[in-house]
Each structure stands twice: as C-alpha cells, then as structure tokens.
Amino acid sequence: MSQIVVCAMYKFVTLEDFEAMRQPLLDTMIKNNVKGTLLLANEGINGTVAGTRESIDNLLAYLKSDPRLVDIDYKESYHQEMPFYRSKVKLKKEIVTLGVDEIDPNKICGKYVEPKDWNDLISDPETVLIDTRNEYEIEIGTFKNAINPHTENFREFPQYVDENLDPKKHKKVAMFCTGGIRCEKSTALLKAKGFDEVYHLKGGILKYLEEVPKEKSMWQGECFVFDSRVAVNHDLEKGNYDQCFACRMPITEDDKKRPEYVKGISCHHCYDKVTEKQKARFAEREKQSQLAAEKGFSHIGDEAKKLAQLNKQKKQQAKEAARKKTEKN
C-alpha cells in the first residue's frame, strides 16, 4: 500500500457557524500536514485532502468530534506522491455550485443506492441513467448506457434538466458522479421539479470502483479526479491520463504527440483558444517549474516558498559580494 492516503469527503448538513469553523479546521490540517482543499458553507462540507495514514485519521477524528459530522461520507484511495501543494479551507455559498436557490439536499433528495445494488438499477430498461459530471470527465470514462448531458460545469445541469427531462415521461431517474455530492444535489433538484423515483449512487463512482469487482463492473474507462493523478483506474490507482496545464483537460500519451501539444503551454483542446500572451505566461511558468524541479523543489506551495527564500538569499549574497569587491577596488 502506498504511503499517501487521498481522502474525498462531503456531507450535506446545516452548519450555521461554518465561518467560525474555518480557522480551527485549517489549523488542524496544517498541524497534521494534511494538504488539499475543504469547502465550508451553510449547507455542509466538501473537499479532497491527502496525507499520511495517521494524518488523515487525525483529521477525520477532529471532524467527527462535531456531532453534525460524525457520519461524514468519505472515500479513500492511495498514491505514491502528495497530489496537493497547499492546505486550504474556503468559505462558499454552496459546497458544490448548482446556482439554484432553495435547493437543499438536507430537506429533500433522492434515494441512495448502494454500489452492490447499482448494476441491477441501471440494467432496468425503465431507468434513465444520467452522468452529472462535466464533458471532459465523461470523455475518459462513464457507466454503460449513461446519458452525457454535455455540460461544461455543474451550473449548466439545471438547464439540461429543463430542456430534456419530463417527470411525466421519465418516471425513474438514476444519477451518479465522482464522489456522490453532485448527484445528491441533482436529485434534490429533480425532486423539487416533481420527479418521483429519483436515485443516486451512494459514495459515487469511487465507492463503486472500490466495492464492485472488475468482472462484475459496468464501469467503462477511467475516473477523472481533481488532483495531480488526473484519473484513476478500476483499482483506484493512477490511470493513463496526464493533464494539460494550460486548460486542465485530460490528455493521453498519443495526445502529447500531436503538433498542438507543447508541455505546460497548450494541447489540442486549447491550442486555438489560448492567446499569445497566455502562451508566453504559461511558458514562463513551465520554465520556473523546470528550474524548481532541477533543484528538488515544487514551483508552488510550501516548497516554492523555500525556493524563493533561497533565491532571495543568493541574490543578497551576490550583491554583498559585489559591494565588497567594489570597496576593495
């Protein structure tokens, strides 16, 4: 088992004091060297973090010490390296942005379906199966026969529902996403619009991959994740995709052979969308990243601060040496 534990978590629960929760939670993350981002809002908590086994256990224990979070939903996977660079706790209006007021999964949502029961549900010809994730996520993997809403972000999902779904026609709707949070909020939206039988995959794709054997799986491809791994395979190990650092789209080794691909600057997804000014900025960022890598540092996060301090010290030393040389002359 690899050293770094990657923990995706969320819970819809009313947190009236979410603003006051921020600093103690951030302090706990920093104290335990847990990196990643957690979002806090009145409607709950959401995020993905990473650290050692002990560090993640300490963070979970801290969260569960709050009675409101004692049953927080979380999924774990493992990676050879730390996939995040910083520790962050952000305050938000929503922990996942749907952009529709009065949609509250704490009050109403669909029915959870355990991973072991998911295949039976989506094999039912009466079930309308919808992937609530974004276009670029769906491109690299999804469930067999799932509908792709072709959304660029989650805020576009309500429009898809209004234009394509009818509670009188679509009697049985099942939805899924990476970790469960988007599909849970989606079920709240559909219930508010009058849909009756609405289901969502408990724990999301990640929990399904963890619990359902490959030979029985109806998952096809890899699962996009929002960290440096880019995607995970059915064993929840880093998959075959990399990421374009300009547009953040997943890319394959074959994609890197295309003429539009320049490491850190562009790929075939964004080549015609990136301005020359942006390309110049990305090129400088890539240069700094390479320099940092050569010196054994990351170009962002805590290690970047150390590198910046070292560079500052070297410049000061060079100036001091030049000054002394001038004085001697």
From Swiss-Prot:
It comes from the Bacteria. Residues 317-329 have a biased composition (Basic and acidic residues). One of its GO terms (molecular function) is oxidoreductase activity, acting on paired donors, with incorporation or reduction of molecular oxygen. SMART domains: RHOD (SM00450). Residues 123-217 form the Rhodanese domain. The active site is at C177 (cysteine persulfide intermediate). PROSITE patterns: RHODANESE_3. GO terms for biological process: tRNA modification. Pfam families: Rhodanese (PF00581), UPF0176_N (PF17773). Its EC number is 1.14.-.-. Keywords: Oxidoreductase, tRNA processing. InterPro entries: Rhodanese-like_dom, Rhodanese-like_dom_sf, TrhO, TRHO_N. Gene3D superfamilies: 3.30.70.100, Rhodanese-like domain (3.40.250.10). Belongs to the TrhO family. Catalyzes oxygen-dependent 5-hydroxyuridine (ho5U) modification at position 34 in tRNAs. NCBIfam families: PRK00142.1-4 (NF001136). This is tRNA uridine(34) hydroxylase. It comes from Francisella tularensis subsp. novicida (strain U112). The lineage of its organism: Bacteria, Pseudomonadati, Pseudomonadota, Gammaproteobacteria, Thiotrichales.
